[in-house]
Amino acid sequence: MMRKSVRRAMLMTTACVSLLLASVPLCAQANDVQQKLAALEKSSGGRLGVALINTADNTQTLYRADERFAMCSTSKVMAVAAVLKQSETQKGLLSQRVEIKPSDLINYNPIAEKHVNGTMTFGELSAAALQYSDNTAMNKLIAHLGGPDKVTAFARTIGDDTFRLDRTEPTLNTAIPGDPRDTTTPLAMAQALRNLTLGNALGDTQRAQLVMWLKGNTTGAASIQAGLPTSWVVGDKTGSGGYGTTNDIAVIWPEGRAPLVLVTYFTQSEPKAESRRDVLAAAARIVTDGY
């Protein structure tokens, strides 16, 4: 209990560091956000991790942001980004075709299953992985890159020393408590997502393509997006796995303001616990209130 209290106090302090030159009411507001996230976590019965970066002034709102969580399908962003990076020097890569065999299909293949005994381009595989969370598409991208460790290696090249991908679909979604495989921290993922979509980790064309794919996601309406004003533009990637693990990572464009980058990770203690997208929506609502 004391360890949890100390951790929360540290996180509250972190939230206020960026407000050192601001007024006491602003720091009190940051503490209020921490208290609301703690209350949400307690009522949910799980473990919640949140990292919000306001790109207007680089302030951060953090909750368990340095703890590891299973990424599940949010890892697809890094795999797709690695392929996009290759396409900067391998012209025509996204148009190259890959055979889709019946044996390639696994547990969730909404797009790939339509192309069995046919082919898909790397561009189509990337879109399927990001916008429909197609697991066969993800495995094809990982195989092309040379294995999960190559995705991790790419993360290192963009300054992310925390991300680790150890397995392929669907086993990367086991999300066993305490298992470091296929995990990252909310803050590390938020920083990586910012670098990929708003920074210089990718070339202009590749960055624009990644953002377009994320904005076209079909799986996120009930997660982060559900906690935001309808006028805000969202590009996101969801993920889910064992132990009721429910994730969403997003770049958010509030109307008339600088983008926000938000990562929400949530997991539970029971292996067959239900997903809780409502928790992610509530967390998004809490941390963006007042923007």
Swiss-Prot record:
One of its GO terms (molecular function) is beta-lactamase activity. It catalyses: a beta-lactam + H2O = a substituted beta-amino acid. The active site is at S73 (nucleophile). Keywords: Antibiotic resistance, Hydrolase, Plasmid, Secreted, Signal. GO terms for cellular component: extracellular region. InterPro entries: Beta-lactam/transpept-like, Beta-lactam_cat, Beta-lactam_class-A, Beta-lactam_class-A_AS. SUPFAM superfamilies: beta-lactamase/transpeptidase-like. Residues 1-30 form the signal peptide. GO terms for biological process: beta-lactam antibiotic catabolic process; response to antibiotic. It is found in: Secreted. It is an enzyme of class 3 (hydrolase). Its EC number is 3.5.2.6. Its main location: secreted. A beta-lactam binds at K76, S133, E169, S240. It holds the Pfam family Beta-lactamase2. Inhibited by the beta-lactamase-blocking agents clavulanic acid and tazobactam; in the DH10B strain. Monomer. The class A beta-lactamase family has a specific amino-acid numbering system, sometimes called Ambler or ABL numbering and often misspelt as Amber. A multiple sequence alignment was used to derive a consensus sequence and then the consensus was numbered taking into account insertions and deletions. This allows use of identical numbers, e.g. for active site residues, despite differences in protein length. UniProt always uses natural numbering of residues, hence there appear to be differences in numbering between this entry and some papers. Extended-spectrum beta-lactamase (ESBL) which confers resistance to penicillins, as well as first, second and third-generation cephalosporins. Has cefotaxime-hydrolyzing activity. Inactive against cephalosporin antibiotic, cefoxitin, and the carbapenem, imipenem. Belongs to the class-A beta-lactamase family. This is Beta-lactamase CTX-M-25. The gene is bla.
